[in-house]
Curated annotation (Swiss-Prot):
Keywords: Cytoplasm, FAD, Flavoprotein, Methyltransferase, NAD, NADP, Transferase, tRNA processing. SUPFAM superfamilies: FAD/NAD(P)-binding domain. It is an enzyme of class 2 (transferase). It comes from the Bacteria. One of its GO terms (molecular function) is flavin adenine dinucleotide binding. FAD binds at G9, G10, G11, M12, A13, G14. This is Methylenetetrahydrofolate--tRNA-(uracil-5-)-methyltransferase TrmFO. Its cofactor is FAD. One of its GO terms (biological process) is tRNA wobble uridine modification. It is found in: Cytoplasm. The gene is trmFO. GO terms for cellular component: cytosol. It holds the Pfam family GIDA. It comes from Novosphingobium aromaticivorans (strain ATCC 700278 / DSM 12444 / CCUG 56034 / CIP 105152 / NBRC 16084 / F199). NCBIfam families: gid_trmFO, PRK05335.1.
Length: 456
């Protein structure tokens, strides 16, 4: 069978993209290297859509939870993954958890039943130079293909190590303690050109005693261990975990990410120092999305366990009540700097016949990966049908996630991201915080319905 679309990778994104195309009668070749003599260090078998790290798709609450809303939106788009999850579901309270083997088998059976879909167990080593292609090879892309992608995109555009710093919701930061400023007021001209006011960082101050206590918490905090196949991956200077830096010496953090120089704290203003004084140490947060709702803890990539991160980082002045959109981590990964390399339709700008989907685009999580695969499939289907493609509204989970990875995120600090309400266009400021999540989901559902009517 001569294919119209080549999909590389049979994980969550690749299988969902293949389903969306095949059910529209489009001829698809789905290449998966597992089962063809190759595997990855993380997979146990060769099943399509094999779940590696967890059997949970997280919350299924579509009224108060962003990932639950994403479940809802995918179901409305006839998602194969959501249908398979329903058949493989196991008790897990309000979460959607599945039997991994049943889930994978359901996905594969549904795809094999499609007459226009061919599943080929083969490793693809080179990025295709022509023909419609979707690359959905995930975080453990084969080295040969990763090298080919790196050649096509530039050596600095393909990361092989996640340096994930925590991200905090802006409205949970105590600005009665923290303040806005840039070090030495540098970069004001560039900031103003980008629509800022020259004060681009949120700064959380520490006294000497607070700093020393915080350092001890970092050193004592319970940490996760590298998986066996990650253990030999070297640290890079820009990926050094915060607790590893802390262990190098008492002052290391103060001369690194917690450097206080050039940052006058106006809350500490006196008659002698009307602009305030420098703290002993400072934790800086940098805006992480264009909406200004999410702020990245600069230099705070970490291997602390998630519960420890919440506990330890809430000892930082100004972050006592911090709510985290994403917690930090450090692990081997392969992902593109998508805001730089991809257009709004997930096409590689330098080779528009190639689209990327799933975790390699910088989305994080099973559901997010599948949703981006679904969108890639819908985009290609529209292209083949000769139809204009309109992306889902940014008020929806699908639209917010797509916008984030294709341009809304800051390219210089781009890291993998789960779906969360901080990515959405804000609801009206008059909506009370208690009902804000319901406002997001109700608006999304209404806007999604209108968008679905436009699909091919």
């Amino acid at each position: 069978m001569t294919h119209q679309v080549h999909i590389i990778g049979g994980g969550m994104a690749g299988t969902e993209a293949a389903w969306q195309l095949a059910r529209r009668g489009i001829r698809v070749r789905l290449s998966e290297m597992r089962g063809g003599g190759d595997t990855t260090p993380a997979h146990n078998g060769d099943g399509l859509a094999e779940l590696v790290c967890s059997n949970s798709f997280r919350s299924d609450d579509d009224e108060k939870n962003a990932v639950g809303l994403l479940h809802y939106e995918m179901r409305q788009c006839d998602s194969l993954l959501m249908a398979a999850a329903a058949k493989a579901r196991v008790p897990a309270g309000s979460a959607l958890a599945v039997d991994r083997d049943v889930f994978s088998a359901e996905v594969e059976a549904a795809l094999r039943a499609q007459p226009t879909l061919e599943i080929v167990r083969e490793r693809v080593d080179v990025l295709p130079s022509d023909g419609l292609t979707i690359v959905a090879t995930g975080p453990l892309t084969a080295p040969s293909l990763a090298n080919s992608i790196g050649s096509a995109t530039g050596a600095d555009s393909l990361a092989f190590f996640d340096a994930i710093a925590p991200i905090v919701y802006r409205d949970s930061i105590d600005m009665g303690v923290a303040w806005m400023a840039s070090r030495w007021d540098k970069g004001a001209e560039a900031s103003l050109a980008m629509g800022g006011d020259g004060r681009d960082y949120i700064n959380c101050p520490m006294t000497r005693d607070q700093y020393l206590a915080f350092r001890e918490e970092l050193l004592a905090g319970e940490k996760t261990e590298f998986k066996e196949w990650e253990a030999n991956t070297p640290y890079f200077d820009g990926c050094m975990p915060i607790e590893v830096m802390a262990a190098r010496g008492e002052e290391t953090l103060r001369f690194g990410p917690m450097k206080p120089v050039g940052l006058d704290n106006p809350h500490w203003a006196t008659a002698e120092h009307p602009n305030g004084r420098w703290p002993y140490a400072v934790v800086q947060l940098r805006q992480d999305n264009k909406l200004g709702t999410l702020w990245n803890m600069v230099g705070f990539q970490t291997k602390l366990k998630h519960a420890e991160q919440v506990r330890v980082f809430r000892t930082i002045p100004g972050l006592e009540n911090a709510e985290f959109a994403r917690l930090g981590g450090l692990h081997r990964n392969t992902f593109l700097n998508s805001p730089t390399l991809l257009d709004r339709q997930l096409r590689l700008k330098s080779a528009p016949n190639v689209r990327f989907a799933g975790q390699i685009t910088g989305c994080e999580g099973y559901v997010e990966s599948g949703s981006v695969g679904m969108l890639a499939g819908l985009m290609v289907a529209a292209q083949i049908a000769g139809l204009d493609w309109s992306p889902p509204p940014r008020t929806t989970a699908l639209g917010a996630l797509l916008a984030h990875i294709t341009g809304d995120a800051e390219a210089e600090s781009f890291q993998p991201m789960n779906v969360n309400f901080g990515l959405f266009s804000p609801v009206d400021a008059s909506v009370k915080k208690k009902v804000r999540k319901e406002a997001y989901t109700a608006r999304a559902k209404a806007d999604l319905s209108d968008w679905i009517a436009t699909l091919a």
